[in-house]
Amino acid sequence: QKTWVPLALLANRGGWAAADNICGKPVEVQGIAGSAVFKTFELEVARTGLSVSEAEAAGFEPASVTIDARSRAHAHPGAESIRVHMVGDKKSGRLLGTQMVGKEGVAHRIKAPAVALHAQMGVEDFGQTDLPYAPPFSPVWDPLLTAANQLMKKL
C-alpha cells in the first residue's frame, strides 16, 4: 500500500534506484516498514511496521501486547525500564509492528523486528530467534522475545 515516510535511508535508496533505472539497470524499491528512532531528553523512542490503528486500516485483524521489562539483567547495575508494544495479525500470525520506549537499548533493539518485518516472519518464528544475551546488554529473555511470547497467547 502506498505511503509517505520521509526518512533519509528511504530517500537514498530511492535515489539510487532512480539512477540505476536511468542507466538501464532495472531496480525496484522493496516495501518499507517505516522504521524510525529518536531521542527526547533521556528517552529513546523507536517504531517499525504498523500500529494497531494502522493495521486495522490496512485490513488486518490485529492483536497487540504491551510489556514492561529491563534493558539488562535485573541484577546488573544500570538496568533501565523498557516498554515494548508489539502488534500481530490474528489471521496469519504475522508480525505487523513494534513500538518501544526506554532510557537505553531501544534504538538498537528495534532493528530485530525491522528485519523480521522485511522477512515477513510470524510472531511465533520471531519469538524463537536467537537474540544475543550478556548481562550488561540484555536479560536472558530479551524484552522483544518476552513481548512476542506474550503476543502468541493472543493470536
Name the predicted role of every residue range.
Residues 1-50, 137-155:
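A conserved FAD-binding loop/helix module that cradles the flavin
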Residues 44, 48, 57-155:
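Flexible, glycine-rich terminal cap/loop adjacent to redox cofactors
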